[in-house]
Design a protein with these regions (language model features):
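Non-heme Fe(II)-dependent double-stranded beta-helix
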Residues: 1-128
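Non-heme Fe(II)/2-oxoglutarate
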Residues: 2-3, 190, 197-198, 202-263
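Residues that flank catalytic or metal-binding motifs in active/ligand-binding sites
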Residues: 65, 93, 106, 133, ...
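Feature marks short, surface-exposed loop/turn motifs that line or immediately flank catalytic pockets
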Residues: 101, 145, 160, 219-221, ...
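A short secondary-structure junction signal
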Residues: 105-112, 119-122, 147-153, 162-166, ...
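Short, surface-exposed loop/helix-turn segments at secondary-structure junctions
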Residues: 111-122, 166-179, 209, 228-233
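Double-stranded beta-helix
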Residues: 131-134, 143-202
Length: 263
């Protein structure tokens, strides 16, 4: 798609992100392939857990186990939307399975994501700057509804100087909050959030599995070399098989490959 047409296409989503702190981009993964992508993700979580048990959770990046899913992470509509907020050069800071079984019970756990998560020792201190420093995406690989537990969000809280995990803010992160709603979408849709927005995983009271992957995008300049599983690497031969656009997003995690961008 030509640049002008692409920017015109994503403008409503960018505007909603700026004003509300979230949006849902539909059909990022096409309907004719989303089932096989979901199957890969569900199967590969077992493989990832077995590998991590044997070798350690920091040894292998999650994306190494799901190449079909990875192929969609540089979707042009998605990246164009994200780049309008983070700038033209972005990379992926975290990839995480988010699969919930049937009849899964869970209380609210409202928070903001890296680098604003006040429970992480490497968070930005309050008050948060009035700038977008992280984008969280939730890839809905099965349909997300109010019946199976669409993600809880509180619109417009991305510009609130308080936080549910702020010790002096008196909000609390375990309770329902005024204005909360559930983000819903069909399989193949992506929930895009300003990482500052207050949000929470949800229970799954339905009889079916709810499958998603969380992928966080960061501006090129943000320090991602922090202790933990998010610094796990991708084997060079696996990295070589990724589409070029996706390589740009994960180059900083490739083993034994000379960087071409993130030097």
């Amino acid at each position: 798609m030509e640049t002008d047409n692409l920017l015109e296409t994503v403008e409503p989503y960018v505007t909603q992100l700026q004003e509300e702190g979230w949006c849902v981009l539909e059909n990022v993964i096409p309907a004719d392939v989303v089932d096989e992508v979901r199957d890969e993700v569900e199967t590969s979580e077992v493989d990832y857990n077995e590998f991590s048990k044997a070798h350690g959770r920091w040894e292998r990046n999650v994306i190494s186990f799901m190449p079909r899913f990875a192929a969609h992470l540089a979707n042009e509509r998605l990246l164009a939307t994200i780049q309008q907020l983070l700038g033209p050069q972005v990379r992926i800071s975290q990839t995480e399975y988010k699969i919930r079984p049937p009849h899964y019970e869970l209380v609210r756990a409202y928070h903001s994501d890296f680098p604003y998560d006040l429970n992480q020792k490497w968070h930005i201190p309050q008050p948060f700057p009035s700038a977008v420093i992280g984008i969280t995406t939730l890839w809905m690989l099965s349909e997300f509804t109010t019946e199976n537990g669409g993600t809880w969000i509180v619109p417009k809280t991305h510009v609130d100087l308080r936080n549910p995990r702020g010790k002096e803010d008196g909000i609390g992160d375990r309770n329902p909050l005024d204005g909360e709603m559930q983000a819903i979408g069909g399989a193949g849709s992506v929930l895009i959030m300003d990482s500052r927005i207050w949000h929470s995983n949800a229970e799954n009271p339905s009889a079916g599995k709810r499958t998603a992957v969380v992928v966080r995008y960061a501006p090129w300049w943000l320090n991602l070399e922090l202790f933990g599983v998010n610094t796990a690497t991708i084997p060079g031969e696996t990295f070589d098989q990724l589409p070029d656009g996706v390589k740009m997003l994960y180059e900083h995690r490739a083993e034994n490959r000379e960087p071409t961008v993130w030097i």
